[in-house]
């Protein structure tokens, strides 16, 4: 179950750090320190970066199964009445094949991107994963409003969801070339949603046709022309107009300093097997000055949350054959 920290797709683009409840990086950059020699003490060099406090969040898992319920399913071969419910192969199977994937989906689709922390009013209420922590998009939206995190925000940011393919190509190209000169030599990702990625690729193809007119094999691929920056889709950004770019070392996934086992207890209550688990997880950015982002005014990450990243385009039916979320005019 420790795979929860590397099993969700965005994890590989982040740098893991450990802390108890909060993490704050040490300032690591200063203004110019070299000067002409003189025989007098004339100190120079002030800390330049704004270290951002990253909040760690404690999450829990309460999940119950009744192993006997699988008696009429294809999982019957994993049901062994000679064993106690918590020792049955079916119990372990459900942890690895059902519980863990569900945790990873919650993390990717509801928590690390669009999550917005909301404290429970009543501890007995069933919590929602999207209210258990602040995600990347929420952090950027709130920082754009407060203006106190030192982040480089693209001025007059455009909502690229309504832009044409050609406009997306032009916008991202300008975004990439406006990143400060000291970062232009670094190989970094420009993170965006799958929808914006497709718009960029279609617009690029329409502009250049079959080729870009150059022998450089990077042209026409995911690298933005004449830069060291490559487009990278994050699943957690589904339906989002936000794009951002930062070194991997600045993109933080926070764990607990003394991380416990995720599944902390398994209890038998009559025929039911109950799983108790907990883990810590937070996300954020170490330094605002190392982050470049385009965040359009009025965007609400929570409004786009869904279990699977879907929109209202598809008609969905439930087990009773009833249509859910029908498309308007369909």
PLM features: residue spans?
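Assembly/oligomerization interface modules of large self-assembling protein complexes
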Residues: 2-77
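Alpha-helical scaffold segments that mediate packing/assembly in large oligomeric complexes
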Residues: 80-171, 320-329
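Short helix/loop capping segments that flank catalytic or ligand/cofactor-binding pockets
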Residues: 74, 108, 199-201
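Non-transmembrane, amphipathic alpha-helical segments
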Residues: 51-55, 84-87, 91, 275
